[in-house]
Amino acid sequence: MNEIYLLVGGEATRLQPLSSGVPKALLTIRGERIIDKIIKQFSNFDNFNFNLICSIKHEELWIDYKTNHNNNVNLLFEKSKLDTAGYIVENLNSMPDKFYCMNGDLLLNVDLPNFINASSLCSNSLIGSFEVEDPTRFGVLEVGQDDKVVQFVEKPKDKSYGNKISLGLYHLHKKDILEIRKNLEIPCSFERQVFPMMSKARLLSTYTVNGDMLDVGTLESYISAHIVKGEDNWISPNNVEISKSAIIKNSVILDNCIVEDNVTITNSIISSNSIISKDTIISQEIIRKS
C-alpha cells in the first residue's frame, strides 16, 4: 500500500469571497471537490492511503468532510503555520521510509502511471516536472544528464537553465530528508529549502511527465477549469434559475442561484446562493449577493 500526503492547508485568497474561510481543496470544479478529483485520480492507478495535512483553522470543515463524504482519509492537523514541508519534517520519525507528497489543490493532466513506475525504480527522492514554453515566469529545475536536479533557478532570464518546472508531485525517501534535516528550521518549504538542499547533495532526481497541471487559485483559472471545449459557460444543474433575457459569457454559476431579467455576466463567478438582481452588469468579478 502506498502512502500519499496531500498538502491541503492553503486557501485561495484570490478567489474571495467564494473561498472565504474554505481550504482551496474543498472548492468544487464542475460540482466535484478538488480533493475528490485528486483522490479518484490516484485510486484509478494503484492502492493508496490518503493522508491530508490540514490547517487547524479548517478543522471543523475537514472533520465534516471525513464524516459525511470520505471516511477513508486520515486527517493530520497543523497547530500553526509550518509551510509546505514543515509538518513532514517535524514528524519525520513517524513517516514511512518512502511516500508520495502532493500539493492538494492542483488538477493534474499527466501520465500518472508512468510517474508512479519511475518512482519505484528511483533510488532517491523524485520530483515530478513538466515543460513550459516560457520558463521566465516560473521557478525552473536545472536538470543534469543523469536526471538529477542540479539547482532551482527562480524566474530565469532565458531558457539557458532549461524549461522544466515542478509539478507539485513528489516521491520522497525518508533517508534523503534525514541527511539534510540538521540544516532545516521549521517552518520550512519544499521549494525554498528542502529541495535546493537535496539537489546540492545529489539526492533529488526528476521525472518529466507528459501533460501539465492547473492551479485553480485565480478567477481566470477557476473559470477555465470549469469550461470544456465547445461550452461558453458552466452553470450548475442544482437549483439555478436564469432569466431568458440574461446574457452570460465565459462564466461560472454555482448552486442555488437566481439570475433575474436583463442581467449581463461576463468572465465572472457567481457563488452559491446568490441572487443577481435585474439589469445588473457584472464583468471580471466574483460575486456573492443576496
Language-model features, listed with the residues they occupy:
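Catalytic-core segments of class I nucleotidyltransferases/pyrophosphorylases
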Residues: 100, 107, 113-120, 133-135, ...
